[in-house]
Amino acid sequence: MNSIADINPTIAGSIEQAEAIRGSMQMKLDEMRRAYHQDPNPSEAERKHHLKQLKKLIGENTEAISKAISEDYGHRSEHETMFAEFIGTGGGIDDILKNLRKWMKPEKRHIDSTMFPFASNTVIPQPLGVVGLIVPWNFPVFLSVSQIAIAFAAGNRVMVKMSENSRSLTRLLRELSPKYLPEDKLVFIEETGGVGIEFSKLAFDLIIFTGSGATGRKVMASAAENLTPVILELGGKSPAIIDPDYDLAKAAERIMFAKQFNAGQICVNVDYVMVHKSQLDEFIDHCTAWLKTNVPTINSD
């Protein structure tokens, strides 16, 4: 099996090394595509096996993964990591396993009999091939594994480009992944400087990106060179609108919890609040009181 070289293009010979890692990624993509052509439509049993192996990967290495995430963060509570990264991820895989057979079945569709008399129409779900997944740092396990699971359910292979801020986790996943899944099914790539844009220039069959609008535009422009379809989940400015009749203390509690969870680094977190002018001071007082009780010092959460 070919492996992705761990190259840092910020040191001497950066141009040559950047070209080397681009070539390495292309070789891995070619290998995964050959494997796809040999097995273009995995059976239900194959897909379930891959999903179960993916769940085992995170389930059997929870402690090591939590430690790696904490190293990348500088510090992150293991309880927060358990809640944010593992519970929803494992439950999501279980849900896919439960529904996979139904999702794989062909479905009849209506057809205009005046245009196509005596014809029938059936939609047959088919894998796309090799999916390129670009993952941010804020929920690195949930936003990688949950989307890998979806791609596996659809019969695809996945190449994952992790964030430059998730180096410890990425190295761990690169070490663990081959023990559970073939390298022509799943591979993790570490961001070593400039890899992200080059990654999105590869001729994947689909690119999934989670991150900022500015970077999303660059990813989409790069993907357009190959007419690669993209799925973009981009951060925005999410409001919280408080009805004047709603319990103001409860609203403040829920909003402040969301703003403090994961240090507020959530794609759809509340960015601003719309509150009746007459209630503004009271709302601020409730927010301040919540913070003093739950986060009395900067390192107390």
Model-derived features with residue positions:
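N-terminal Rossmann-like NAD(P)+-binding subdomain of aldehyde/semialdehyde dehydrogenases
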Residues: N2-N121
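Rossmann-like NAD(P) dinucleotide-binding subdomain of oxidoreductase/dehydrogenase enzymes
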Residues: D112-K250
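A generic fold-level signal
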Residues: G88, V123-Q126, C267
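Short, well-ordered beta-strand elements within core beta-sheets of diverse protein domains
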Residues: R34-P40, L133, I241-I242, Y272-V275
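Structural signal for hydrophobic packing residues in well-ordered secondary-structure cores
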Residues: Y36, P40, K55-I58, T62, ...
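ALDH superfamily catalytic-core signature
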Residues: I11, Q17-E19, A214-D301
